[in-house]
Amino acid sequence: MAGKTLYDKLWDSHLVKQRDDGSALIYIDRHIIHEVTSPQAFEGLRLAKRKPWRIDSIIATPDHNVPTTAERKGGIGAIEDQVSRLQVQTLDDNCDEYGITEFKMNDPRQGIVHVIGPEQGATLPGMSVVCGDSHTSTHGAFGALAHGIGTSEVEHVLATQCLVAKKMKNMLVSVEGQLPFGVTAKDIVLAVIGKIGTAGGNGYAIEFAGSAIRDLSIEGRMTICNMSIEAGARVGMVATDEKTVEYVKGRPFAPKGAEWDLAVEAWKDLVSDPDAVFDTVVRLDAAQIKPQVSWGTSPEMVLAVDQNVPDPAQEPDLVKRGSIERALKYMGLKANQPITDIQLDRVFIGSCTNSRIEDLRAAADVAKGRKVASTIKQAIVVPGSGLIKAQAEKEGLDKVFIEAGFEWREPGCSMCLAMNPDRLGSGEHCASTSNRNFEGRQGAGGRTHLVSPAMAAAAAVNGRFIDVRDLIQH
């Protein structure tokens, strides 16, 4: 009998009941909630006269709708948009009513759900983790079974601590070799999506492995797993190792004392067996990956910074040709235009993909001693949590950004999505460290280019895309 993959082990350890229709009942260890997908779920509980089943499994924070400017210090009443204000207030009210742990808008621990979960040690190896947000795959970086759920499923988990799900197939994405200087986790995952496409992972749980993945920090692994969903996979994960254990140790929600020792011993098994069989295997050579830039309206429309935008006339597949033509029109680009000729209007460094302290350090290394180009209308840096903001300020990163001409903001989802005051104007091009470049994602008519934090900072000071390796020393 073949060995088990990491996903197989996590699935089996959370399986409550296998059902005749092929679906299964899965137990949920950690439930993270925010203000957008939870109000309807709580209302459903009330109508059914139920209460949350396991209060201690839930943590909450507002992130999607919160302002990132100083006005938020005035509290929820300072949120201008009526719907946003109501959603944040409703989250507070629901958490207060049921005694749920919430890091409220002006709590120093507040931040983006997929940043604060790991930061607090609420995400642990071997756990099943869900949130009403598609980028919950981020937490898979800890050897956890993590994925997004819909609002009705949020209610189911609140009420029963279980979820109806179907087991996925196994995909291994192996990235071997050493990353070149200046190439990051963000470049790896964009290259993976460019290779397999946004539907490549449909129906799969992806395990990212190989020497290049093992060499990444935990924050880098979170970036990779975060964008599993952009590759079509609801679940992305990395096996647990010494780096995972060291990252979790001592965090507020992490086990303590004898429980810690038992946990660490159990976590040693959170790897795929040597003889495990994967349904699909994808291989990349890390040495061949260059800094990536998305050019179109899908994350799979991505190229190395030294390449040219594609020419639809050279695409024999009629469907793909049509997609390229539509993307070029929306993005205001010309066939064969060099990536480095794309003029930018705004730069956004933040989101659940790239707003952690290592991301901010990488961007600050590029910005230090330089100025944002005069052609850039706005460049903003939004830390992923209040604790990250405080750490960055302790290191003086805020001063580096401010002196260079960036705006230094409060934590939140910000310009990743047009659900708060931070958004693009129609026709504006933005170098963004976020995860999605769909039409209108950052604002109606906005044009998004996905890049790493270092590449975003380089674009800010250059006014156009440039290979960041031309600006920094090895």
Curated annotation (Swiss-Prot):
EC code: 4.2.1.33
Keywords assigned by UniProt, alphabetized: 4Fe-4S, Amino-acid biosynthesis, Branched-chain amino acid biosynthesis, Iron, Iron-sulfur, Leucine biosynthesis, Lyase, Metal-binding
GO MF term set: 3-isopropylmalate dehydratase activity; 4 iron, 4 sulfur cluster binding; metal ion binding
Instruction: State the free-text cofactor note.
Output: Binds 1 [4Fe-4S] cluster per subunit.
Residues given in the record as [4Fe-4S] cluster binding sites: C352, C413, C416
Which reactions appear under catalytic activity for this entry? (2R,3S)-3-isopropylmalate = (2S)-2-isopropylmalate
PROSITE patterns assigned: ACONITASE_1, ACONITASE_2
Q: Report which superkingdom the organism of origin falls in.
A: Bacteria
> PANTHER family of this UniProt entry?
3-ISOPROPYLMALATE DEHYDRATASE (PTHR43822:SF9), HOMOACONITASE, MITOCHONDRIAL-RELATED (PTHR43822)
Q: How does it assemble?
A: Heterodimer of LeuC and LeuD.
Query: What is the protein's name according to its record?
Result: 3-isopropylmalate dehydratase large subunit
Give the species: Pseudomonas syringae pv. syringae (strain B728a)
What's the name of its gene? leuC
